[in-house]
Regions:
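A juxtamembrane structural motif centered on a specific transmembrane helix
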Residues: 2-33, 352-406
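N-terminal membrane topogenic signal
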Residues: 34-48
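Hydrophobic alpha-helical transmembrane segments of multi-pass inner membrane proteins, especially
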Residues: 45-53, 58-61, 68-261, 299-360, ...
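Short, small-residue-rich loop/turn micro-motifs
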Residues: 63, 269, 273, 359
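Glycine/serine-rich anion-binding loops at beta->alpha junctions
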Residues: 140-150, 190-192, 273-278, 367-381
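Transmembrane helix boundary and interhelical junction motifs in multipass membrane proteins
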Residues: 193-198, 277-282, 292-294, 307, ...
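TM-adjacent membrane-interface loops and short helices in multi-pass inner/ER membrane proteins
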Residues: 247, 251-294, 298, 307-309
Length: 406
């Protein structure tokens, strides 16, 4: 009797197993994610290479007349930019091969170094004043702009602290992250460099949202930020900055003063037309448009290469932004995602600001066009940040479907 009962139980168990096996076969298998290691993103690398090459050509064309007028080498600015490119290229190579997950350990050290350099600019004779703004320090004949290094410093700080959560009320976050960022913002605002402050604040907001931050808290912070901007505009903003805002939409009110650069930039756009006047044929660079190799280099490109050249450059930046956010979406960890989002937005928004200023959509800001404008600090920092992006792109998530039972 016991033997028959045991056999019955065995048969019942076997039937149950058989039914479950049949159900498992009928049930659709859910995909799971696996981290794979691949080569760096080639599309991103090619895009940056094109931007850098266009930058070399534009810098030489825009700066050669000025160098000749001053009795110097026509390629003087290009040579300096090439030297900075070599430094930036080695930085790109290093960060492409350096595991991005180890960068978090350096966040406070790097932020402290940037704060120290900013203090040298603001409070010591080493600071160099150009066009009323004290933003540079001289090192071995080269001018270094520490505020450019604040971009990766802020991104690294926020990625490190937001990788777990986006709680803005956490006391530890204030001590280790928010206070250093506020110190950097204050030192940069003192130079004054309001455009960089806006760029860093915007990057911080985007990273906060990417980390899953509360929209309610975001709009509260946005309201507080707008109130601060209004107060700053009426109290502590510099007179020349207020004049820029006043003449932004009506530059004809002061054609020889604050509106001069905008008017000359718009003339360059109008002269370029659809296909441009040809490489090297710009008239506006002949002492008409100041800073044509830095802040207004996009206007010279528009004049020489026309609408076609403008679309090409904007398309390259859109490609860079697309690849950067794709890298962020495929990254297997939150730290890498936030790094990719912060770097991509920082470069993309800076390009947007520069192009908007050159085309009179925004007031003059003094922000260079990444990879293209003359400026060693901007080029080195941009290439190093792209190196981090390329490193993140080597590790990505892949969904694997229809895994057979072993």
């Amino acid at each position: 009797m016991k033997k028959e009962e045991g056999c019955s139980r065995i048969m019942s168990y076997q039937g149950f197993e058989s039914r479950n096996s049949s159900y498992a076969e009928r049930r659709p298998r859910r995909p799971f994610q696996s981290t794979i290691v691949s080569a760096p993103d080639k599309a991103l690398l090619i895009t940056v290479a094109f931007l850098v090459i266009i930058g070399f050509m534009a810098i030489f064309s825009a700066s050669a007349p000025k160098c000749i007028d001053e009795g110097g080498n026509p390629a003087q600015f290009l040579i300096k930019q090439l030297i900075c490119f070599v430094v930036g290229f080695f930085g790109l190579k290093f960060f492409t091969n350096y595991d991005y997950k180890k960068l978090g350990a350096w966040n406070l050290i790097f932020a402290g170094t940037v704060i120290f350099l900013l203090m040298l600019v603001d409070f010591t004779p080493l600071g160099v004043t150009v066009n009323g703004a004290k933003r540079w320090i001289n090192i071995l004949g080269f001018q270094l702009q520490p505020s450019e290094f604040a971009k990766p410093a802020v991104v690294l700080l926020l990625a490190t602290i937001f990788k777990k959560d986006a709680d803005l009320l956490d006391q530890n976050k204030w001590v280790t992250t928010f206070i250093p960022i506020l110190i950097m913002l204050g030192l940069i605002f003192k130079q004054p460099n309001l455009s960089m402050v806006i760029l860093l604040l915007s990057t911080s907001v985007v990273m906060f949202l990417a980390a899953g931050g509360s929209l309610k808290l975001f709009f509260s912070c946005l309201g507080a930020m707008m109130t601060t901007v209004v107060i700053a505009a009426t109290t502590i903003i510099k007179p020349y900055q207020m004049q820029r805002i006043k003449t932004w939409q009506h530059p004809e009110l002061d054609p020889q003063g604050a509106g001069y650069n905008i008017i000359q930039s718009l003339i360059a756009f109008a002269s370029g037309g659809f296909s441009g006047v040809g490489y090297g044929g710009s008239i506006q660079k002949l002492s008409y448009l100041p800073e044509c190799h830095t802040d207004f280099i996009f206007a010279i490109i528009a004049e020489e290469l026309g609408w076609v050249g403008c679309v090409l450059i904007i398309g390259l930046f859109f490609t860079l932004i697309h690849r950067g956010f794709m890298i962020a979406s495929r990254c297997p960890d939150m730290f890498g995602k936030l790094l990719a989002v912060g770097i991509t937005f920082s470069i993309g928004f800076q390009a947007f600001l520069n192009i908007s200023v050159a085309s009179s959509f925004f007031p003059t800001t003094g922000v260079p066009l990444p990879f293209i404008s003359y400026g060693g600090s901007s080029l080195i920092v941009s290439l190093c940040m792209v190196g981090v992006l390329l490193n993140i792109s080597k590790k990505r998530m892949k969904k694997i479907r229809n895994i057979e039972n072993v």
